[in-house]
Design a protein with these regions (language model features):
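Bacterial N-terminal signal peptides that target proteins for export
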Residues: 1-10
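Substrate-binding/active-site clefts of carbohydrate-active enzymes
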Residues: 211, 215, 225-409, 429-438, ...
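Hydrophobic faces of well-ordered beta-strands that scaffold small-molecule active sites
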Residues: 216-218, 272-274, 333-335, 414, ...
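A solvent-exposed, charged loop/short amphipathic helix patch at secondary-structure junctions
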Residues: 232-250, 524-547
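Active-site-proximal helices and loops of the catalytic beta/alpha 8
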Residues: 341, 401-403, 407-511, 561-565, ...
Length: 706
């Protein structure tokens, strides 16, 4: 059924709901922080849930209810702060209502797993305040929410869904409608539609910097980025410390200078992630062998004082200037914060030496770098003891220290270090304090966890952390691009796995690399082997280069095409925008260069600029659903679609060109095509009947729009 005729059938049925929703449900809308909360996942049997994981401001509730007979709710605490849901159903969508003082907000309930084989739905249009969605299979049931309020009248007809936008949405500068549905075969992808005063946002110019799905991150290490104030330069200047691991002079003023000269804006960056700024020691610690050297705390990860700006990076006034300059340039700044440990000479540990976990295990071993065996207690090194954050008397003051930076400075959120090693109660307490103290601040938190999607996802809740870096996507992409024995199917599979685990509109960080990994371009170019070497030692004993320049730069460009076009938030590590080579830490932390690029690097920079700017200008890439149209060992072609607009992406990881024919879904008609961003030699053309031919050069990609 065409959009107009379908809308005509349902508008009359919905009109009464649209007109009276303000009068009947307004009390619900005023309850607490109504920022959209993540869905609640259940499986057959009983699952336990914590209220603050969804509504972090609420310590408890009067009751939690559901009108769905498939769900049995059990109160596990007097105040419903902990409750259980029991169900025998599978692959369904529903909701529960959380009540407080006679008012309620909802949590969407998703049963079973997402069907990534054939259950897709897409937003195809809006008319008269009614959104139409088309699915690939008959829809069994659907749930739609505005913020966290159930939209009562949702019309389902065959493969179509119609959802009315509540009139009250017109009173809000930014709100969202989310749509969830299931077929007999499984759950569909979910749909998220940002609204501007009640109207669906269809143009990127109306997206705001606080809209998290629109972010493009840039990760920088302050000391190694730009020196803007030589008056605060300082080195240990000891024969015990090689210059490579001593302070180099980068500071907050240097970041401000690069914001002002347009460096970040020219790259399409919307959010700057800065390394830790807390006071670190003035002496040297740790010990490297061959070559022998100790280390300074130039990186910022050895906090002495958790609430003091390290004067080698600048002053509080310079920090405020940097933040205001970024905001005036329509950019966010998030702070890298270290909660897992303190330096052994921290006054806090001098006063409370018992606040750490045990260094010696019962079997006599030292509890150092036992990342998985002793995940929540292991120390990183002897001079940075891990805090016992499972104890309330430790967790309370340490979350207060973290809160200091967003209460007293206008940061837009955090990048949290070593999340994997910090217990869940810390994240619940910190986010509760943040939401309670500053409910009007739309802050974003992203964490660092290596592990399974289950472990990573256990932290991704509205009452804990918004997202994490998707290291599984990075490692899979790295291996497929570098190793010809790996398959492009592996990348497609991990993208589907992430969508199923974190949601279709997750804001997981998709990285080009980071300060703890060898430079990707040296892996892709072959100068750094993937396996069988000490990737840190390589940087001490030789000059690590790209290797095969053509292959190295093509591989890095392909990686950036992946992270910018799949769901999630792309993140550029400093230097990767132009392709600086290097081994692992500390060779991947050389001082940043802003000029003097060779021809390859200039081309690399231009590709990064074009890709990230296009991503920020494309509603389908920021908010669209994703479906695979073709995949084999060498190539992957997928579609991103949003409100009738689509982008086709093709990628080829082999050294021979690929010519592929793909068929578009019925609602994504072919027309005049534009190759928006692509490797030289890529092309696309309409063949009729909804078919497109895509030509991809060796190690090439193409981003195509209509």
């Amino acid at each position: 059924m065409k959009l107009k005729s379908f809308i005509g059938v349902v508008v009359a049925a919905m009109l009464s709901f649209v007109m009276v929703s303000c009068a009947t449900n307004e009390a619900k809308f005023e309850l607490g922080d109504n920022s959209p909360v993540v869905p609640l996942g259940v499986t057959k049997g009983e699952t336990t849930h914590y209220l603050t994981d969804y509504y972090p401001q609420w310590v408890g509730a009067d009751k939690v209810t559901s009108s769905d007979e498939r769900l049995t709710l059990t109160n596990l605490a007097e105040d419903w702060s902990e409750f259980a849901i029991t169900t025998d159903a599978d692959a369904f969508v529903s909701s529960v209502e959380v009540w407080h003082d006679g008012k309620a907000l909802s949590i969407v309930v998703l049963g079973g797993k997402r069907d990534t084989e054939g259950s897709y739905m897409s937003s195809v249009g809006v008319e008269g305040g009614v959104v139409k969605v088309e699915a690939t299979q008959p829809v069994k049931e659907a749930v739609a929410v505005w913020q966290n309020n159930i939209i009562e009248d949702v019309v389902v007809e065959g493969n179509s869904i119609a959802v009315a936008i509540p009139v009250i949405a017109k009173d809000y500068a930014r709100s969202v409608v989310r749509i969830f549905a299931a077929s007999e075969g499984g759950r569909f992808n979910d749909i998220l539609l940002p609204l501007e005063y009640g109207n669906v946002v269809t143009e990127a110019k109306d997206i705001r910097r606080q809209d998290h799905q629109s972010q493009v991150l840039y990760s920088l290490m302050i000391d190694r980025f730009n020196n803007g104030n030589s008056a605060n330069d300082w080195k240990i200047n000891s024969p015990e410390v090689l210059d490579k691991v001593d302070y180099q002079g980068g500071d907050l003023a240097g970041i401000t200078a690069k914001i002002k000269d347009g460096f970040f804006a020219d790259l399409g960056i919307t959010t700057i992630w800065i390394s830790p700024i807390t006071q670190n020691p003035y002496d040297a610690w740790g010990q490297n062998v061959n070559p022998d050297t100790k280390f300074s705390g130039y990186h910022g990860y050895w906090p002495i004082y958790s609430t003091v700006v390290d004067k080698r990076f600048g002053t509080e006034e310079e920090l405020r200037e940097m933040l205001s300059t970024a905001h005036n340039d329509n950019m966010n700044v998030i702070l890298d914060y270290v909660a897992n440990h303190l330096h052994i000479n921290s006054p806090v540990l001098q006063e409370h030496p018992d606040w750490t976990t045990e260094l010696i295990l019962p079997d006599g071993r030292e509890n150092i770098a036992l990342w998985d065996e002793q995940r929540l207690t292991t120390w990183f090194d002897k001079h940075i003891p891990t805090l016992d954050l499972e104890r309330n008397e430790v967790c309370e003051p340490m979350t207060d220290s973290a809160l200091h930076w967003v209460k007293n400075f206008d940061f837009d959120g955090y990048r949290h270090d070593a999340c994997k090693h910090i217990p869940l109660n810390y994240w619940r307490m910190l986010t509760h304090k943040m939401k309670s103290a500053m409910p009007e601040r739309n802050m974003w938190q992203i964490g660092e966890t290596y592990g399974s999607v289950e472990l990573i996802g256990s932290y991704v809740k509205s009452g804990m952390i918004d997202s994490q870096f998707d290291f599984n996507l990075y490692h899979t992409s790295r291996d497929v691009i570098v190793d010809a024995n790996r398959s492009m199917r592996d990348i497609a599979a991990v993208v589907e796995e992430s969508e199923a685990a974190y949601g279709s509109h997750h804001t997981m960080g998709n990285i080009t690399g980071n300060h703890d990994k060898p430079r990707f371009i040296s892996l892709a170019g072959g100068d750094m082997p993937l396996w069988g070497i000490d990737d840190k030692a390589e940087g001490w004993h030789r000059e690590v280069v790209v290797g095969d320049m053509d292959k190295g730069h093509a591989g890095l460009q392909l990686l950036k095409a992946i992270i910018a076009t799949v769901p999630g938030v792309p993140c550029i590590y400093q230097g990767d925008e132009y392709g600086v080579p290097g081994a692992n830490d500390p060779d991947n932390r050389d001082m940043m260069s802003f000029d003097g690029y060779n021809d390859y690097q200039m081309k690399e920079y231009a590709q990064t600029q074009a890709m990230m700017k296009y991503r920020r200008a494309s509603m389908p890439l920021m908010y669209g659903d994703i479906r695979t149209l073709y995949v084999d060992d060498a190539a992957w072609v997928f579609l991103r679609h949003y409100m009738g607009e689509w982008v086709l992406v093709g990628m080829n990881v082999r050294d021979t060109a690929k010519s592929l024919r793909v068929e578009l879904p019925s609602f994504a008609q072919c027309g005049a095509l534009e190759v928006a961003v692509a490797t030289e030699g890529a092309s696309a053309s309409c063949l009729g009947g909804g078919n497109i031919e895509v030509v991809l050069p060796p190690y090439g990609y193409a981003v195509i729009s209509k």
